[in-house]
Design a protein with these regions (language model features):
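Alpha-helix capping and helix-coil boundary motifs
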Residues: 5-6, 80, 119, 254-256
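Flexible, glycine/charged-enriched surface loops at secondary-structure junctions
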Residues: 9, 21-25, 223-233, 256
Length: 256
């Protein structure tokens, strides 16, 4: 089972970033797939929390939304949304938040609000939901997005969820005590913020991908770390788990 798609590589690389001890606030879509692959492989005791208030959920299929009944059915317990945000999130009980977005800039700020001017946008996006609070209050943030010039842009038209702001110690100057984004996992590479400037820097390149491909698909002059490794390819077990849960999800949603 050596063949895999760029999306599978991205999902599995994201799953590997999680540990067995994490308490993770999970976003819908790619973050949900990554978190559940981690739970079904190397991190069986990870605690997955969704915005709707489900704690310790272990879904057999991936949810379509935070209100999917599968999340409540398999949760250890469910709390009200105000408690979820005030006690769990703002109370500092969540180690890792997993987010995606429509657009991201070099300092890992995210836009899920509008493309184009706010008053007259070309596209109006779904909005932030709980993402701004997640980005501010989780111990650290992982982001999953496909690398493209459309998504990785020089300047965001709107900042929905703050990453590292203008770079440097911007979060600290605003009184934010959490780390913010520590890793961005894409279908071509993995990026981490520079320790000083906080600009996203390529630290790992997926097998078969070139530096030229990465540069061509980014909206700014992307930087590479002094030492860049090759991302380990997915194992047969990782691919099997991911494909099985995707197949179950497709079947369940087609039958619904």
């Amino acid at each position: 089972m050596s063949d895999f798609t760029p999306t599978e590589m991205m999902t599995i690389a994201a799953a590997r970033a999680l540990t067995n001890d994490d308490v993770c606030f999970v976003g819908i879509g790619a973050p949900s797939a990554a978190c559940n692959v981690a739970r079904l492989t190397h991190a069986p005791d990870i605690t997955l929390i969704y915005e709707s208030g489900t704690v310790g959920t272990k879904p057999d299929v991936l949810p379509l939304s935070i209100g999917d009944g599968e999340l409540c059915d398999t949760a250890l317990f469910t709390v009200a949304v105000p408690e979820m945000f005030r006690y769990w999130l703002q109370g500092g009980h969540i180690t890792t938040g997993f987010l995606g977005g429509a657009q991201i800039d070099r300092f890992a700020n995210l836009n899920t609000t509008v493309v184009g001017p706010y008053d007259h946008p070309k596209v109006r996006l779904p909005g932030g939901g709980g993402a701004p609070e997640i980005a501010s209050n989780c111990g650290q943030i992982f982001i999953t997005m496909a690398l493209s010039k459309r998504g990785f842009v020089e300047k965001l038209p709107f900042i929905t969820s703050m990453g590292h702001g203008e770079g440097g110690n911007h979060r600290e100057r605003l009184g934010m005590k959490t780390k913010g984004p520590t890793r961005v996992i894409t279908d071509l590479c993995i990026l981490e913020p520079d320790s000083v400037t906080k600009e996203l820097t390529v630290v790992s390149i997926h097998k078969g991908v070139t530096r030229e491909q990465i540069s061509e698909n980014c909206g700014w002059a992307i930087k590479f770390a002094d030492e860049v490794i090759e991302t380990p390819t997915p194992t047969d077990t990782e691919l099997s788990v991911l494909r099985d849960i995707n197949a179950r999800t497709k079947k369940a949603h087609e039958a619904a």
